Amino acid sequence: MSWDLIFQHLFIVLAASLLSIAVGLPLGIWAYVSKTARPVILRIVDLLQTIPSLALLGIIMVVLDPGKLTVIIGITLYSLLPIVRNTCLGLQEVDPGVKEAARGMGMSKPYRVLMVEFPLAFPTVFTGIRIAVVNAIGTAVFAAFVGGGGLGGVITQAIRISDMSLILAATGVLMVIAVVLDLIMSWFEGQMRKSRGGSKKMWIPVAAIVLAFILLLPYGRGGTGDILLYDGDYSETQLMHHMVKMLVEDQTDLTVTIQDQMSQVNNWNSLKDDSHTCDLMISYDGTILTTFLGQDTVDVPEGMTIYDYVQGELDSYGLTQLEQLGFENTYAIGVPQALADEYGLETISDLIPIADQLTFGAEQEFFTLEGSMKYDPFVKFYGLNFQDAVSVDMGLKYSAIENGSFDVAVVYSTDGLNKKVGLKVLEDDQSFFPDYNGVFLVRDDLLEKYPEVADILNQLAGKIPTEQMAELTYQVDVEGRTVDEVAREFLVSLGLLEA
């Protein structure tokens, strides 16, 4: 966790707060002055509040692409409810005598509302702003899922590796931010109530938000550089992307910028898009086939490798796979070492006699009906009949394994957490799971512009065995070493960087 991430989080919160104020105040005033528009406006802002945060961000991202703008607009929509409702309510509660006096002085309705009623209503309006800002601090955590940055990525990673100290630290920072901002706004609110809505004082807190936003602008800029890529939400992706940066910047004059965290699917969508917000990513030929292209391993012609088939399919996307890196990260089946010792488990087939005593666990994706690399085809292929099968969030899977929530789990072969929680990875003795080989996926236009990049990155081809990648991720996820430190040390060991 770094100060940059904290300031990024604050930037997102303040930007969304300013935008929600700019949109919410006029909507609230409109709802007050128009009895016809009022129920429509209030129902719309109520409806927006009921949409799950991730779903809303996903919808916006389809239109705007990943990044901070998607998050800011999403939080803005979420923040409208308290601002719009409190604005309308505050104006309704202004003393009728004051309204009548202003009317009697010949003031026009717009002038009365803006210059007389609104200043008196502002303490109530500001309560809505205060609620919106504090709520935005928590909602901004979801920025990590759409490449928006902030502290959400830290929390997600900490949950995945069961790092309670990091979870508490990141949560503590969010709580401190929320408490400090709430105390400051509470003080301003008290001052405004004492001044009975002085028109000058009411803009002081808004001006303070604007000033803080301006100071944080450097943390809201998008990626700039010759080559852009996103940080991953797994240490494996982070390690490989940092190796890209180190090698390219060491051997050329190009600048590589690693942007905010991004999931594999969203990274793919950004990579193939014409927005040029991403130039390359690490992935796996099998993942490209099944997850990105929406095909299945049975679609690969007999005698052709997944790698070669995928490359033919990628031509229409303007993308190229570089040479295979040596490691594969396919699905694997893991069991606690104690269970393996008790029953002498070495292969997946060894589970057949005891499957009816065991609970199977995997992320929800493994239980979907589409595709051959899923639960139903797997148990039918091996003749397994588990006592129960449960789904769990990918980030919580290893915690569930440690807690004994299930006995058999789907894992990834290079995940360093397998070693941490004491899982024995069983041999896929009947070869159900195909190898998913690690490859760099690069835009063709980048290779046309900088052809040397392919040669530089292909220096890693075949140099990272699966066991080596598992050890590298273990050093990051379990031993707590930084991604930069582990990546640099490995490149030095290969002779690709100087010590």
PLM segments and residue spans:
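Cytoplasmic-entry segments and transmembrane alpha-helices of multi-pass inner-membrane transporters
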Residues: 4, 8-12, 27-59, 75, ...
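Transmembrane alpha-helices
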Residues: 14, 77, 110-142
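Bilobed "Venus flytrap"/periplasmic-binding protein-like clamshell domains
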Residues: 226-256, 261, 326-398, 481-484
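Ligand-binding "clamshell"
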Residues: 275, 291-322, 405, 417-431
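A bilobed periplasmic-binding-protein/Venus flytrap-type ligand-binding module shared by bacterial periplasmic
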Residues: 330-341, 436-450
